[in-house]
């Protein structure tokens, strides 16, 4: 396992999802894919939610492909990896920074990506998860939720980098990555069987409307 997390380009992300599911019926090696029961929808914080089950923030919710894998495994409430003003080698601590007595997917610092990189990655994941939900009939594309997570002190949260991250996920419509992802999908409609231009244009720019504050970090 490599010790540096490298985001996947959006076109590669989408093509990997389409090719793998159509040939193997899996998504990023998740074979036991969960299809939601559409009769058991609920509402949380003003948005639809097919299941209250999901994943907490961690290295498994930092890269877009891992977020898609979480959704494929049944997660419908996804707490995105915590963002802070310091990241990577700037933290000055060894990896991994969390004890794993048995085994775990944890080879990262408490923040591997810069706030802007994290925002871009989560927006790519937002589009990709919407697409796999619709294209493969895994559930209602409007019934899963992303939850922002920031820390670890007020001074860091108020910095321009983290503030821009918060604003970008609250309304991504003017971000470059949102526009690029949307345009890529519109330009490649031939790749899809169940996704059309109307669906792509309906994908909301308000990625997150809830937030988790991470205030304790040991």
Can you say where each PLM-predicted feature lies in the sequence?
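Conserved, well-structured core domains of diverse proteins
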Residues: 1-37, 71-76, 80-200, 204
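N-terminal alpha-helical transmembrane segments of multi-pass membrane transport
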Residues: 44-45
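Conserved, mostly hydrophobic/aromatic
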Residues: 55
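Short, acidic/polar
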Residues: 62-69
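Surface-exposed cleft-lining segments at the edges of enzyme active sites
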Residues: 201-213
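Conserved small/polar residues in nucleotide/adenosyl-binding loops
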Residues: 216-218
